[in-house]
Amino acid sequence: MTTRTAVASWLQPVLAWRDALPASCACAVVFPGYRPDLVQAMASALQARLVDFRKQKMAPLGWQASNLAPRALTETAHAEMIHGRDVVLHNAEAMLSLFAREGREAWFAEAAAQDWPQRLILPLTLFAHDLPAQMIGHVIELTAADLPSEGLLQRLAGLA
């Protein structure tokens, strides 16, 4: 359980939501826009491992990253869970964007059906509508009004 006094107000409902979830599920935090700064802050507040899938797995492969199968997301999450903490799988949508809606839906359904060693937390912006019905109870949707405003430097940093 995380101490609530030292976290930003927008994270309070996220922490409460996470604490109410099963300890071995796939779940999603839906952001209204791409906010890597907030994903990083969230992972820290949740005391979860932050894995930037695009940066750590796709970028080193260059154009060959398009040959990855969706199971690369699953394998990466499982490998990171060995450390005994929940995993925030940031930029999973970069990988999922390579597949048609049916492929994304299939991966989300597979993730929802798995018994994970820890929670798999998926920050989403684009593909929340592809989540399966069995995951709906494991989703929190944040609105722009819930979040701190994004400064120009944060916007520029998000482009990197």
List each model region and its residues.
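Short acidic, S/G/P-rich loop/turn micro-motifs used as interaction or catalytic elements
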Residues: 34-38, 56-60, 92-100, 127-130
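Amphipathic coiled-coil/heptad-repeat helices and related helical stalk/stem segments
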Residues: 10-13, 73, 104-107
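Glycine-rich P-loop/Walker A and Walker A-like loops and their local beta1-loop-alpha1 context
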Residues: 1-50
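Short glycine-rich substrate-engagement loop in P-loop NTPases that contacts/grips substrate
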Residues: 55-79
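Conserved catalytic network of the ASCE P-loop NTPase/AAA+ motor domain
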Residues: 20-21, 78-84, 111-117
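A generic structural motif
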Residues: 50-59, 120-124
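Structural motif
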Residues: 86-90, 121
